[in-house]
Amino acid sequence: MIFHKNWLGLIFLLLFLGIINVMRVPRDNSVKLKRTALEWSLATLTATLILWAAFDMEGQFQTINQTEWIVPPALNFKWGPLFLAVDGISLFFLILTALLTPICILISWNSIKFLLKEFLLCLLFLEVLLMGVFSALDLLLFYILFEGILIPMFLLIGVWGSREEKVRASYYFFFYTFVGSVFMLLGIFQLYSSVGTTDYQALLNIELPISTQKWIFAGFFLSLAVKIPQVPFHIWLPQAHVEAPVSGSVILAGILLKLGGYGFLRFTWPILPAATEYFAPFVIMLSVIAIIYGSLTTCRQVDLKRLIAYSSVAHMGLVTLGLFTHTIEGLVAAVFMMLAHGLVSSALFIAVTYLYERHHTRLIKYYRGITFSMPIFVSVFLVLTLTNMAIPLSCNFVAEFFSLLAAFEYNIVIGVLAATGMVWSAAYSLYLYNRVSFGASSNYLLFTRDLNRRELIAISPLVILIFILGVLPSLIIDPVKNAIMFSPGGA
């Protein structure tokens, strides 16, 4: 059945009620602050799961909320209606956002020592903005929310970052992504001046001249490529990950990196098809470079967080590779890879944080032989590293299989080059697990407590979903495929 059209509005209402209730809790009552934020984020997750359970997977937009823009009458222009809607693509990114937010609160339960109330409000505001980005059907609204995400993320890294370089890392993140976003704004202005609207559904029925499409695509590409991040626009990512608190790393790797791929799939292919097709060989070349460069650079890392960050560059290269082959397999693989990477990379950052909280170092050379002292952690870490190298029955295997299938269909040389990423992925994943888990116990590791109940509860949903999506990929593939086929930009 098709759920009530205002259900999406109810989800946003729950988000704002959560923010209001956290604001009402006294600053010195830290336990109540955390419980209130956790309860309301779980309520949002429940509402999002109900939306998924009642969603009609045929592919069309559902739960459409429409509101008029507030524009002063004296101005000589009028923007179209403000549309928020969900289809088979955006639905899963909403679920991923709703899932990772309470997990972020849980994993930060004991690590945030100051400005706890502001920290929780940052997380909840970030959830509102991300939910809005993934349901926006107006380009101007998408841009406003897209830009708004910079503020809470800047604060998360700069205020609650874990090391002395956190302020520099936050400025790196803000500068790169803000400058990139300016080009998108210029593209939106060019689009509006050409057709007089930024409404997504109206733009689907308008065919722009190829020359205009190319200029607009260039603006969108520079913005979205920074967010993915695509080589050579990735410089900000390792620094931001290393300095960010664990919740910042989870949000960054799990959701924010997906905004670029989502923007390409949602806007550039349907609205700028000719320009996207024209630039596809160039983007595919960059994607192959990202896969090889990201994988080789990952093998050289000595910091646990940097290793996972650079592996993300390689995996997101597979996303853009799938997107710009413009085949059903490639587009489905891109969405599946984004969701799988959101689960696996988030879980890996959480696992690394568990080690850091016990031993206060992220340098791989100090870790050795924790199998006997932390058997539960080692078991979870084994699942995550094997998934990261895309073993069968894992979600990464499904995503990489379809990505490489699309690559080989596009060009056999591209397919072979992209496939080398799987070899290097296995190399650094096995090295990481072997170095941390086996051998004689390191003299540097004095604190050996295994995972507690809270830590297990936080990471378990991600591990379970990794297997569920690996065994039952049709849960995502079918609705995503239907949504792509329904879209004018579908293959």
From Swiss-Prot:
Which is one Pfam family of this protein? Proton_antipo_M
Q: What Gene Ontology cellular-component terms does the record carry? A: mitochondrial membrane
Q: What is its EC number?
A: 7.1.1.2
Give the location in the cell: Mitochondrion membrane
Main location as per UniProt: mitochondrion
Record InterPro entries: NADH_Q_OxRdtase_chainM/4, NADH_UbQ_OxRdtase, ND/Mrp_TM
Function, as annotated, reads: Core subunit of the mitochondrial membrane respiratory chain NADH dehydrogenase (Complex I) that is believed to belong to the minimal assembly required for catalysis. Complex I functions in the transfer of electrons from NADH to the respiratory chain. The immediate electron acceptor for the enzyme is believed to be ubiquinone.
Name of the molecule in the record:
NADH-ubiquinone oxidoreductase chain 4
The species this protein belongs to is Metridium senile
Name of encoding gene: ND4
